[in-house]
Amino acid sequence: GSAYIFYPATGIKKIHGGNGNDFIVGGSSSDELFGDAGIDTLYGRNGNDILDGGEGADYMDGGSGNDIYYVSDIYDLIDDTSGNDTAYVSTSFVKIPSFIEKVIYTNGAIALPYWVDALLPNEASGNYFDTLLGSSNTFYYNFPIALPSYDTNASHGYGFKTFSSVQIARTEAALNYIASVIDVQFKKTISANGLNTFVFANNNQSSSAGSANYPSASMIGSDIYFDTSAINSKFADGSYAALTLIHEIGHALGLEHPFSYAQAGGGGLSDPPYLTGAEDSTAWTVMSYEDTSAQYYLNFSPLDTAALQYIYGPSKTARAGNDIYKVSSTAPNFIWDGAGTDTIDLSGVNQGATVFITPGYWGFVGSQKAATITSSGQITVNFGSIIENLTGSSFADKLYGNDTDNYIVGGLGNDWLDGWGGNDLLIGGPGDDELNGGVGIDTAQFE
């Protein structure tokens, strides 16, 4: 069962919660808190504490002092803003908040890709935004005629004006588009007073075109206000207002700015890490302030899609057939898929490639990866996508499967094929090939 354990006394304490959902509060000295199994809450309070939630999605707050956290689940959430803290991370692709000074990956764990990490605020750690929706995957939305009663921010009511029919139509078009990209649905509601509810309204803003809140456990989460300037009256394609609309919805879904410098027009600093150089551009993320008119439409850019699919997963109704994704050598390849039996095809590239069909990995055409994922010939599969098959080029490739049953064909060249998990069929093709089935009952064919 669940346990509530409090140790206010001084002296080092080693506390185990055992099975069940535990609430453990340490004392005023250095404690060692172990949640063990279950969904646990651990508070270290004072001292240099060790916190290990164990199995399950755990909340850990070391309090003051130099604390050590053990993270073993992608849903483990750390809240600690003081001291010099360390996290030992034994599972891959975890969002670690930037206020943890030292991160050590163990057990072969891999860090979250920088192009996703840079668009997620600290509040997104522990997959918090996804957990707010639960299994329904549903956001609600409302166009209030007055400032909602729960909103105590007086500035939100300054010049308050409800959305016009044109603004409503464009907003609903944006939401329909988003539901075709990520695994959420949007339902209109008659009341703004609810959790996971987007509020859309106009007001007077002195230095910004719009403002939005991240998702949260309070009703103010995901509320969006737009300046009453004329350009925002239509959110028309080809106008900056269209970019403003999709940008603010990005915030309301959980995306942050990618830049590390103060911006004119109210753009605040975001949590590190950051995108730099050419990647801090709306060509790659609509959350950037470095914009061009090519992005003045109701569409996310590639890095936005990658980050949002990390949070919510890809739409299960889009790209739902048996799709073939042909890799380009002259553009980056951000691959995502909703359903079906799908193939990544390297037959069109002019040199060997390294490809991982497990989401989150960084593949590339050529002998080595580029400096940035947005460079030509880079290859990655977005989180939540399942690709079953992989076809190599006419050159020497390194091809890696995933945990499903894969069909991997090397083609010409001296290839390396690795099935990873699942019951895989590996076909080397002509050339001196090396085949490794990995975990599962695998079949290898040589020519």
Predicted regions and their residues:
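Catalytic zinc-binding patch centered on the HExxH motif and its immediate surroundings
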Residues: 202-222, 269-273, 277
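Zn2+-dependent metallopeptidase catalytic core
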Residues: 152-192, 339, 348
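Active-site recognition of the HExxH zinc-binding catalytic motif
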Residues: 243-258
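Disordered inhibitory propeptide/activation segment of secreted metzincin zinc metalloprotease zymogens
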Residues: 104-163
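Acidic, glycine-rich calcium-binding repeat modules characteristic of RTX/beta-roll
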Residues: 1, 6-102, 158-159, 232-245, ...
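Active-site scaffold of zinc-dependent metalloenzymes
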Residues: 143-145, 212-237, 286-288
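Acidic/polar low-complexity surface segments
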Residues: 9-10, 316, 354-386
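Short, well-structured beta-strand/strand-turn elements
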Residues: 176-196, 209-217, 233-234, 256-261
